[in-house]
Amino acid sequence: MRSDWIAPRRGQANVTQMHYARQGVITEEMDFVARRENLPADLIRDEVARGRMVIPANINHTNLEPMAIGIASKCKVNANIGASPNASNIDEEVEKLKLAVKYGADTVMDLSTGGGNLDEIRTAIINASPVPIGTVPVYQALESVHGRIEKHSADDFLHVIEKHCEQGVDYQTIHAGLLIEHLPKVKSRITGIVSRGGGIIAQWVLYHHKQNPLYTHFRDIIEIFKRYDCSFGLGDSLRPGCLHDASDDAQLSELKTLGQLTRVAWEHDVQVMVEGPGHVPMDQIEFNVRKQMEECSEAPFYVLGPLVTDIAPGYDHITSAIGAAMAGWYGTAMLCYVTPKEHLGLPNAEDVRNGLIAYKIAAHAADIARHRPGARDRDDELSRARYAFDWNKQFDLSLDPERAREYHDETLPADIYKTAEFCSMCGPKHCPMQTKITEEDLTELEKFLEKDSALA
């Protein structure tokens, strides 16, 4: 779809959406996003220029359907997929991608660490994806040296990053905010470093006793991203991995560095979003969102959860969706889903479905709470269908129509029950929605109440 849009830009030194927005240009991608979001195109341009919105759109991802992540747009959901050394393959990951898109993923991250040729897996996913694809390049850096990350040089990291750009990756998680001086701050934590990318960089720093190469070569990464319009997802290497560690000095020290890096990228018109926690008690979620906005000059915030309790392995799509809904309400732009398998294993297709639906609920609830225009229209339409016992319309309006129909049909499968004025919960005689109060009923009641009031 984008081939004709991109052709005139190829070969230019800077092809980012932010670069064009700051020149006053409304690109085809911005116009497409404006129609998707039902917002004025000049507002989209201005938000991208300001850095409060990103449109992840690598010029080599030509089959992309552009979307926006930012406070002015609807709250978005990211789904993680990816093969591991112990499970999955190309075909399975492409099927997970298709399932994620089916159930509403706005972006998808390929977090493959094994299971085959990582370049082939990534290319297959990008070629099949209408949504932006994100990656974590240090995973491939580690895989390429068979787990001996200390063997990598800064140039090796840059080579992997540029390769991902060439393949069409729309945004990359770059763990540049973890500084050597931050590492002693994790000593008082229960779970230390829980970011895989952060752990890889920490290994390199501890071995060489040198500063993080992604930090020292950050401007080199910017130059690469400018040529492809790849967006930064600045990784939170020191995000808390349990409630005890939330909002500690390690996390907030890195956040300050991420804010500085955000502004450096903006100086070169490169788009940035900032990743966040993690595991956070409910009473600290608002603080975390506000603090990110303050430190990072309102760059879009993108959180993993956060989980609001640590005692529910197997149900962390629920513990995290609670925190995600709150974070979205307070202004987080994108929610990274968590599946029931979090902390336990690699998610399968059903886990992807359950995680995505939980997060679509959270994002939608946040949009309603933030009074985004039209956010509640679908809810009201479904409520009218429910009151009218229009079962098929209820199913169609659901976030997961197949699941809604499946649960209804477990006890009342016959077609005749699709027009019945009851379900198996109340049965035919006890459904309160059968009590229809008409205008005539209310008029008669008002007359009675007026008469009764006069007698009193």
From Swiss-Prot:
It catalyses: 5-amino-1-(5-phospho-beta-D-ribosyl)imidazole + S-adenosyl-L-methionine = 4-amino-2-methyl-5-(phosphooxymethyl)pyrimidine + CO + 5'-deoxyadenosine + formate + L-methionine + 3 H(+). Zn(2+) binds at residues 279, 343. Its cofactor is [4Fe-4S] cluster. One of its GO terms (biological process) is thiamine biosynthetic process. The lineage of its organism: Bacteria, Bacillati, Cyanobacteriota, Cyanophyceae, Synechococcales. Pathway: Cofactor biosynthesis; thiamine diphosphate biosynthesis. It holds the Pfam family ThiC_Rad_SAM. Substrate binds at residues 80, 109, 139, 175, 195-197, 236-239, 275, 302. [4Fe-4S] cluster binds at residues 423, 426, 431. Binds 1 [4Fe-4S] cluster per subunit. The cluster is coordinated with 3 cysteines and an exchangeable S-adenosyl-L-methionine. Its EC number is 4.1.99.17. It comes from the Bacteria. Belongs to the ThiC family. InterPro entries: ThiC, ThiC/Bza_core_dom, ThiC/BzaA/B. The gene is thiC. The keyword Transferase does not apply. GO terms for cellular component: cytosol. GO terms for molecular function: 4 iron, 4 sulfur cluster binding; carbon-carbon lyase activity; zinc ion binding. The keyword Iron applies. Keywords: 4Fe-4S, Iron, Iron-sulfur, Lyase, Metal-binding, S-adenosyl-L-methionine, Thiamine biosynthesis, Zinc. Catalyzes the synthesis of the hydroxymethylpyrimidine phosphate (HMP-P) moiety of thiamine from aminoimidazole ribotide (AIR) in a radical S-adenosyl-L-methionine (SAM)-dependent reaction. It comes from Synechococcus sp. (strain ATCC 27144 / PCC 6301 / SAUG 1402/1). NCBIfam families: PRK09284.1 (NF006763), PRK13352.1 (NF009895), thiC (TIGR00190). It is an enzyme of class 4 (lyase). This is Phosphomethylpyrimidine synthase.
